[in-house]
């Protein structure tokens, strides 16, 4: 370090050298300051003033940016949410007591996935750190794609939740990316082998912050040993991951990264849960977006999402649990029915449900409160919130024990009853902490009187000091006879007795001179000196003792962290169940039936979101699908008629059913669905340089490669992003492929404007045609929103254009062009599946592009164009009966000229 740098700047550079890729918040008195390039970054991102102070290593003026220490909760989240890592370098000793330069050191590193402060994330969402481990596994065969064995872990240090799984994935990492979409981590850490894999790292970066991190271990075996040491267990078998090497490795990577950034052991992370993808319906990022499960497409908020419709939970734990349920619908009919039994019971018992929801409304975020307690960054207000939450639980427990029958509700009641210390912990906090404590835990004022005798005495000394001084002053006036005598205080000389020079002859002999002034003398007595020592140290001692008592309370609560976290989980589950019952009753939902066959039967189904937003009532529709005759539903009809809404509502009803929710229908029976695939909507992926059509084909490829007979596929307007012939050919091939896949086919809803596809109903036995009914009233088009059997051969495009507000001149011209095309009798040949012969029908969907192609080169779907000659056109318009001989002769000359 250069001699021109101050000792404090030397400390700053030492911290920066230790954390080169991290912004440094360096505590200087009442400010956190940053220097050099960090200062420039912070000033820009936080929009604060950039100044300069001192010299850098080269002797130049050092850029400086700073924020008040008490405003860190305002500014820090803004940097973290932009993906920065921030190292907090604190003063490690009291500057007043420091000998020389104040000791400073980094006490924690805040990253997007390891934030603990509630200001940095939403109560309704988990803040996951994702860790990935894996290895490429070659497959035999010249053209075989390689696979990867992948382990993934998710850790939320704010709640203590810790999950891991392991699976085999393709070289495109579809399963891993689906997990990413479902869990939505704030940060992902990768070992170098995966970090340097462009196929993975770039796709991860598109959705989260990605860091390279390798834990300080030799391999999975050592990772397992360290996990066992952390959890204080002899084996990981009870956690389900004993032989899952990559899951174990990723789990330790997540925990080591979290403990390294927080610079402490995270004892509130006290269990690891292993889960399998085979337990849950798969909803990939495309499906989550298209169906707007937890956020909408418009602004990625939750308005008009399924989550928003269903989320009337009373607690943060309930909000988070509901989101997890929606992102991971169950595949087990038995487990789904456990949830449905509870929802049904709570629906049938409205008074019980009302009481439970009323009590739950007093429960705060127990999970995160406990996390902060164990972590050590909680304050007295957190303890008051925890106390109020615990006080609300005994009536919940007792009411459940007395009134419930269903399995899940009984498990919750028994679990709450097993927490024997619940009331004692609430009582301890109530006896110790004042009702409205200050935020700071180092300034006193948070412990109630009567909790600790020593503290009461110190507080009494401190609070009664003014009265004692007043009494002492009055006593000395009477003893000395000096009416103007006064007792004062300043920081330099402490307490003193002041006597003016005019009264100096009356000063008692036991007064000891302390200070001489121009017009007065200041004295003290042994009694005043002794009291001064008590007064000045009492407040300091009281504050220190309060903090000590507070710390003891935290330790007591920490000893029960596991029971508190389990209680929080039970309350979250109860909150979701009461919420689903409330929503079911308010929205007229019914209990669905779940089966292990492939049938889907929905009567009077409604879109759960749209029915809450439309005016004038929602038109319900039926859906009937099976594996024999109605496996592939081909839906035709005009734009805006409701095809997409119908398809989406079918999928949403199925998802709700497998979540364990009642559904918007009069009857519903759902054959378990393992994955919902969607190809709906059109947009360009500009970030990846992909056009609308390319995006469509990538999503379609994923569906065709991965859909199983247990899946549900929604396809909307496949092929519209390219030429008509290409689009039609692709659409037809897709229908045939899905219908014939694995000889049993795939359940699918396919909306299209290629009306020629409706002929496939006669060729493919499990394809069935449906269309959206419309009614024409003059030039007006009335959408009936009803899905009815059979096909339609009209798109009503011009009528829809009129409804959209297209200028009337354009509408009129479009009608003229349409009539002209119809007069020209543009025909196409399509294959009649009944007899294999060609039949002719009007090509209403492809007029504009058909002439771009050679009719004889259309891959079997030839288009024959019969254009009338100019002479034929004139002849058709003639009315021979009304023509005179002269007029007939003139017309004949005109026809001859046309022929020439």
From Swiss-Prot:
Residues given in the record as ATP binding sites: 637-644
SUPFAM superfamilies according to UniProt: DNA repair protein MutS, domain I (SSF55271), DNA repair protein MutS, domain II (SSF53150), DNA repair protein MutS, domain III (SSF48334), P-loop containing nucleoside triphosphate hydrolases (SSF52540)
A matching Pfam family: MutS_III
Superkingdom per UniProt: Archaea
Record's keyword terms, sorted: ATP-binding, DNA damage, DNA repair, DNA-binding, Nucleotide-binding
Gene3D superfamilies assigned to the protein according to its UniProt record, in alphabetical order: 1.10.1420.10, 6.10.140.430, DNA repair protein MutS, domain I, MutS, connector domain, P-loop containing nucleotide triphosphate hydrolases
Protein family membership: Belongs to the DNA mismatch repair MutS family.
HAMAP family tied to this protein: MutS
Functional summary from the UniProt entry: This protein is involved in the repair of mismatches in DNA. It is possible that it carries out the mismatch recognition step. This protein has a weak ATPase activity.
Name of this chain's protein: DNA mismatch repair protein MutS
Source lineage: Archaea, Methanobacteriati, Methanobacteriota, Stenosarchaea group, Methanomicrobia
Gene: mutS
């Amino acid at each position: 370090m250069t001699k021109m740098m101050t000792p404090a700047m030397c400390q700053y550079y030492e911290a920066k050298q230790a954390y080169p890729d991290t912004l440094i918040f360096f505590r200087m008195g009442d400010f956190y300051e940053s220097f050099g390039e960090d200062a420039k970054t912070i000033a820009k991102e936080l929009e604060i003033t950039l100044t300069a102070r001192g010299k850098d290593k080269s002797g130049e003026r050092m850029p400086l940016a700073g924020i008040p220490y008490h405003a860190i909760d305002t500014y820090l989240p803004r940097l973290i949410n932009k993906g920065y890592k921030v190292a907090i370098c604190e003063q490690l000793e009291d500057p007043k007591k420091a000998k020389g330069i104040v000791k400073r050191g980094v006490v924690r590193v805040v990253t997007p996935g390891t934030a603990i402060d509630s200001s940095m994330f939403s109560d309704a969402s988990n803040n996951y750190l994702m860790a990935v481990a894996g290895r490429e596994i070659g497959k035999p065969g010249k053209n075989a794609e390689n696979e990867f064995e992948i382990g993934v872990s998710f850790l939320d240090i704010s709640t203590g939740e810790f999950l891991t799984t392991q699976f085999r994935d393709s070289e495109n990492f579809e399963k891993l990316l689906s997990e990413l979409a479902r869990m939505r981590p704030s940060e992902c850490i990768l070992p170098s082998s995966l970090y340097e894999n462009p196929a993975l790292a770039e796709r991860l970066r598109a959705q989260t912050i990605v860091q390279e991190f390798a834990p300080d271990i030799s391999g999975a075996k050592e990772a397992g040993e360290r996990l066992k040491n952390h959890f204080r267990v002899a084996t990981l078998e009870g956690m389900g991951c004993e032989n899952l090497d990559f899951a174990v490795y990723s789990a330790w990577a997540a925990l080591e990264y979290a403990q390294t950034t927080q610079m402490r052991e995270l004892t509130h992370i006290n269990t690891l849960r292993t889960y399998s993808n085979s337990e849950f319906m798969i909803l990939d990022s495309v499906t989550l977006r298209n169906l707007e499960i937890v956020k909408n497409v418009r602004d990625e908020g939750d308005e008009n999402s399924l989550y928003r419709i269903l989320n009337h939970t009373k607690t943060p734990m309930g909000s988070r649990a509901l989101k997890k349920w929606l992102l991971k619908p169950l595949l087990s009919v038995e487990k789904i029915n456990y949830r449905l039994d509870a929802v049904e019971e709570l629906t049938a018992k409205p008074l019980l449900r009302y009481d439970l929801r009323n009590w739950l409304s007093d429960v705060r975020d127990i999970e995160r409160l406990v996390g902060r307690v164990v972590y050590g960054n909680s304050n007295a207000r957190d303890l008051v919130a925890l106390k109020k939450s615990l006080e609300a639980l005994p009536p919940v427990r007792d009411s459940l024990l007395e009134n419930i029958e269903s399995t899940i509700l009984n498990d919750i009641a028994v679990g709450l009853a097993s927490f024997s210390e619940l009331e004692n912990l609430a009582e301890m906090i109530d006896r110790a902490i004042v009702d409205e404590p200050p935020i700071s835990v180092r300034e006193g004022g948070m412990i109630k009187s009567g909790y600790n005798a020593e503290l009461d005495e110190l507080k009494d000394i401190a609070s009664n000091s003014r009265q004692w001084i007043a009494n002492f002053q009055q006593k000395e006036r009477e003893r000395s006879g000096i009416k103007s005598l006064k007792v004062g205080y300043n920081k330099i000389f402490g307490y003193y007795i002041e006597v003016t020079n005019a009264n100096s002859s009356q000063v008692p002999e036991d007064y000891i001179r302390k200070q001489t002034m121009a017009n007065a003398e200041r004295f003290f007595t042994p009694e005043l000196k002794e009291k001064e020592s008590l007064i000045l140290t009492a407040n300091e001692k009281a504050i220190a003792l309060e903090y000590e008592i507070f710390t003891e309370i935290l330790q007591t609560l920490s000893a029960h962290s596991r029971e508190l976290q389990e209680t929080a989980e039970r309350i979250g589950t109860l909150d979701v169940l009461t919420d689903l019952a409330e929503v079911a009753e308010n929205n007229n939902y019914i209990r669905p039936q779940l089966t292990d066959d492939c049938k889907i039967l929905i009567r009077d189904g409604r879109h759960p979101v749209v029915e809450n937003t439309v005016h004038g009532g929602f038109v319900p529709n039926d859906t009937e699908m099976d594996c024999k005759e109605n496996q592939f539903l081909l839906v035709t009809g005009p734009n805006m008629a409701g095809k997409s809404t119908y398809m989406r509502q079918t999928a949403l009803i199925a998802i709700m059913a497998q979540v364990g929710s009642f559904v918007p229908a009069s009857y519903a029976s759902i054959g378990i669905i393992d994955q919902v695939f969607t190809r709906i909507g059109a947009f360009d992926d500009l970030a990846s340089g992909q056009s609308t059509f390319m995006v469509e084909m990538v999503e379609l490829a994923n569906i065709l490669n991965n859909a199983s007979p247990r899946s549900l596929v929604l396809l909307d307007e496949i092929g519209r992003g390219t030429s008509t012939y290409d689009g039609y050919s692709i659409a037809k091939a897709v229908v045939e492929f899905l219908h014939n896949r694995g000889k049993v086919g795939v359940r699918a809803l396919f909306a299209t404007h290629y009306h020629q596809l409706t002929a496939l109903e006669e060729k493919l036995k499990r394809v069935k045609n449906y269309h959206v009914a419309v009614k024409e009233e003059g030039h007006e088009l009335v959408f009936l929103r009803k899905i009815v059997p059979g096909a339609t051969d009209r798109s009503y495009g011009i009528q829809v254009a009129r409804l959209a507000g297209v200028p009337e001149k354009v509408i009129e011209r479009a009608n003229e062009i349409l009539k002209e095309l119809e007069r020209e009798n543009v025909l196409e040949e399509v294959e009649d599946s009944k007899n294999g012969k060609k039949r002719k029908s009007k090509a209403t969907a492809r007029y504009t592009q058909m002439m771009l192609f050679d009719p004889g080169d259309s891959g079997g779907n030839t288009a024959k164009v019969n254009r009338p000659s100019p002479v034929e056109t004139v002849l058709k318009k003639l009315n021979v009966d009304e023509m005179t001989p002269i007029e007939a002769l003139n017309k004949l000359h005109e026809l001859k000229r046309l022929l020439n």
